[in-house]
From Swiss-Prot:
Homodimerizes, then multimerizes. Interacts with cytosol exposed regions of viral L glycoprotein present in the reticulum-to-Golgi compartment. Interacts with human FLNB. Phosphorylated form interacts with host importin alpha; this interaction depends on the exposure of the NLS, which itself depends upon genome maturation and/or phosphorylation of the capsid protein. Interacts with host NUP153. GO terms for molecular function: DNA binding; RNA binding; structural molecule activity. Belongs to the orthohepadnavirus core antigen family. This is Capsid protein. Phosphorylated by host SRPK1, SRPK2, and maybe protein kinase C or GAPDH. Phosphorylation is critical for pregenomic RNA packaging. Protein kinase C phosphorylation is stimulated by HBx protein and may play a role in transport of the viral genome to the nucleus at the late step during the viral replication cycle. GO terms for biological process: microtubule-dependent intracellular transport of viral material towards nucleus; symbiont entry into host cell; viral penetration into host nucleus. The modification Phosphoserine is found at S160, S167, S175. Its main location: virion. Residues 182-188 are annotated as: RNA binding. It comes from Woodchuck hepatitis B virus (isolate 8). The keyword Repeat applies. Sequence repeats lie at residues 160-166, 167-174, 175-182.
């Protein structure tokens, strides 16, 4: 069965695979970032968003991977076999966890639509032959003007920011308007 964990987020595993393997930060750096930015949301009882749920699941997978590698390191006596297995785990499962953490952290940080646009534009850029493409790849950290950065905490964080409508103009004084008396020079 071919399951794409990014389909419900409007993306695909194929789009993430356009990014080079060294694009994704180290797993420990991603875990530290997730913990630093979203510890309350990840450890709390309340459901925040599908991205938070996916990060929780990726962190559980990462924890199980580290336990598996520790077990293999202590139980496999052949250094060569141990190295082959650890490298295979890091290159396959570790990469999938890195991709997942990067994707969901980026969606929470920059917005899902911005990440989607980045993946598509990078995919187009990388598939364009070198002589015909611009020299610089698209950059995710360059935010378009219309991107809304999410607010931290509270129930309002999940809603879009409130639009401010202009308030009606008020009179300068609250007392009824008085008619100005005309000056004597105005009568001339």
């Amino acid at each position: 069965m071919d399951i794409d964990p990014y389909k419900e987020f409007g993306s695909s595993y194929q789009l993430l695979n356009f990014l080079p393997l060294d694009f994704f930060p180290d797993l420990n750096a991603l875990v530290d970032t997730a913990t630093a930015l979203y510890e309350e949301e990840l450890t709390g009882r309340e459901h925040c968003s599908p991205h938070h749920t996916a990060i929780r699941q990726a962190l559980v997978c990462w924890d199980e991977l580290t336990k598996l590698i520790a077990w293999m390191s202590s139980n496999i006596t052949s250094e060569q076999v141990r190295t082959i297995i650890v490298n295979h785990v890091n290159d396959t499962w570790g990469l999938k966890v890195r991709q997942s953490l990067w994707f969901h952290l980026s969606c929470l940080t920059f917005g899902q639509h911005t990440v989607q646009e980045f993946l598509v534009s990078f995919g187009v850029w990388i598939r364009t032959p070198a002589p015909y493409r611009p020299p610089n790849a698209p950059i995710l950290s360059t935010l378009p003007e219309h991107t809304v950065i999410r607010r931290r905490g509270g129930a309002r964080a999940s809603r879009s920011p409130r639009r401010r409508t202009p308030s009606p103009r008020r009179r300068r004084s609250q007392s009824p308007r008085r008619r100005r008396s005309q000056s004597p020079s105005a009568n001339c």
